[in-house]
């Protein structure tokens, strides 16, 4: 029986490249001239810290980072930015987390979405991924379209397609 896995993974090398590209863009933008603005990638906690003088500039930094991530093939939904910015002294900063892996609550939403679609497939949660099994490839492709179209707030990839 054909099957595939729904996963949410981020290539950290591409994230590193995006951070370097964003830092390079900061040095060429006129609105960030003589402004202590920076990006900092923490691979251990899988987060990106943006720091600048004002909250408006921090928001611009986040927009630049999303643009660079998108150019490197990582969707903007993979970056989870908190509403409140940290303020200490003269600087504002925000630590945006990179979403990787499917949490249990998110996996349950995916399984419920698949079951409510009435497609003849079975979905089961396996750790940080969801395995979908069906009798025909067409049903599995329908599930892929459903997941891509469903606004689930996180980018997903489809791996391990077996016939």
Swiss-Prot record:
UniProt keyword Nucleotide-binding, yes or no: yes
One GO term describing the cellular component: cytosol
Assigned keywords, A-Z: Nucleotide-binding
GO molecular function: nucleotide binding
Keyword Oxidoreductase (UniProt): no
A UniProt-annotated Pfam family: DUF520
Disulfide bonds: none
UniProt function note: Nucleotide-binding protein.
Family note: Belongs to the YajQ family.
HAMAP family (UniProt xref): YajQ
Name of the molecule in the record: Nucleotide-binding protein PC1_1036
